[in-house]
Amino acid sequence: LKDLQQRFKIAFLYVTHDIATARYFSDRIAVMYLGRIIELGPPDDVTEEPLHPYTKALIAAVPEPDPANRFRERPVVPGEPPDPINVPPNCRFHPRCPSFMEGKCDMMDPALREIRTAHFVACHLYGLDA
């Protein structure tokens, strides 16, 4: 796919839950939760140094090819995914977030902020008043 991109000067929009493969096809990765971008950045930054708790959960869910680790417990995002028709107000991930901050996450929608060069996150953990 990279060869096709270069040869024909085209772009791909690769939509997946498999963040492990996304890093190989992408110049940038945008992680979305219930229709909102919650993290955006270069593939290595997003996959090796994720910022948002949901991105961290996606990466932790990637199966490890080492057979010795096949029985390793993987963290699971708590709770049930919300109804996409009736999304939670403010931070959409707050009902399931292990880092939930009452009075912040449930009261204010986090802005997408640049935390590192070209690496953005929408999370109160990285807000100006965090």
What are these regions (language model features)?
Residues L1-R72:
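P-loop NTP-binding/switch modules centered on Walker-like glycine-rich loops
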Residues P43-A130:
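Charged, flexible cofactor/metal-binding loops and thiol motifs
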